[in-house]
């Protein structure tokens, strides 16, 4: 592959599967053109159903979903932004995919929470965010509130 020739590189559901995802970020930096963009998607470890499961003392890997057996790294909005910033990237845009609890693998766990706890959790900003989808650029300062 030639250096600095690609306008876009897509890492869709990739970073969470790697022991050292920063190595991919370094490689992408070398491959992107000066105006190139990295398109990423990662699951949200702060999804309220997953948090409910943790609150009940469980962390059950599954064949698919947020706790896919092949996931090695976990990100929340803040930890994703920090991870990218620490490795010389900024998020130009960040969007989300929402998943209602009845459609998730965590519904039963969430239903066992005390009502006040469930209401509090659902009131947090990324409670129903199942996945983050972002556009990042090397060296770009992160948006104030992507």
Name these PLM-found stretches.
Residues 8-14:
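A short beta-strand submotif of the Rossmann-like class I SAM-dependent methyltransferase core
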